[in-house]
């Protein structure tokens, strides 16, 4: 009897521990190999883009602005970064093949070397499901005929709280962003 009680307690405790932690549950899913979601060269400017916001809450819509060389078609797939059995990411949405747009030149500031592409038009959107698990997401954009890149963004769950705080280095990502010909380190 005692052994049955201990086994029952362990099973119930394990179930509720995993059930109450959506991130642990999500990361236990099978993932996609890096050969599917990775990009060989993040400085490949044949296709490049950004999200309208770096951080969005579940239920919001992320808006992408994407420049595609020669206006070629492209695919857009959304992945969540996580453990996933060592695969590193899991496909969350496939927006399919989209028509590419050659965007106007960004507004440059020669004194700082910065380039502002806020004048680009919206290329695609993704409505973040209300059930999405918080974390780092990437949109892999892949141009027909070659070229791929990532657009990183964070999905939050504003209804939850945690003892753990994780800050993503988006300022560092921007500093190393070489789009337009140079980064902060060139």
Roles of regions detected by a PLM:
Residues 60-64:
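Structural beta-strand segments of beta-rich domains
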Residues 20-46:
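Proline/serine/threonine-rich low-complexity linkers at boundaries of modular beta-sandwich domains
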Residues 1-2:
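Positively charged n-region of N-terminal signal peptides that target proteins for export
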Residues 6-15:
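Bacterial N-terminal signal peptides
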Residues 71-81, 89-96, 145-186:
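Aromatic-Pro/Gly-enriched surface loop or interdomain linker
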Residues 51-56:
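Short beta-strand segments of immunoglobulin-like
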Residues 73-74, 84-86, 101, 107-109, ...:
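Extended acidic/polar, glycine-enriched regions
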């Amino acid at each position: 009897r005692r052994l049955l009680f201990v086994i029952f307690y362990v099973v119930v405790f394990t179930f509720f521990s995993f059930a109450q932690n959506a991130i642990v549950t999500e990361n236990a899913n099978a993932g996609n190999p890096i050969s599917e979601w990775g990009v060989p060269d993040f400085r490949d400017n044949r296709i490049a883009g950004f999200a309208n916001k770096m951080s969005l809450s579940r239920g919001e819509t992320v808006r992408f602005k994407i420049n595609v060389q020669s206006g070629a078609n492209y695919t857009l797939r959304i992945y969540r970064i996580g453990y996933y059995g060592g695969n590193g990411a899991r496909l969350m949405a496939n927006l399919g093949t989209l028509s590419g747009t050659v965007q106007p030149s960004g507004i440059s500031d020669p004194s700082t070397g910065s380039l502002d592409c806020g004048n680009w038009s919206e290329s695609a959107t993704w409505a973040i499901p209300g059930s999405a698990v918080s974390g780092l997401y990437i949109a892999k954009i892949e141009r027909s005929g070659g070229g791929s890149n990532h657009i990183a963004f964070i999905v939050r769950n504003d209804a939850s709280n945690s003892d753990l705080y994780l800050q993503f280095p988006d300022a560092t990502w921007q500093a190393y962003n070489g789009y337009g010909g140079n980064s902060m380190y060139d």
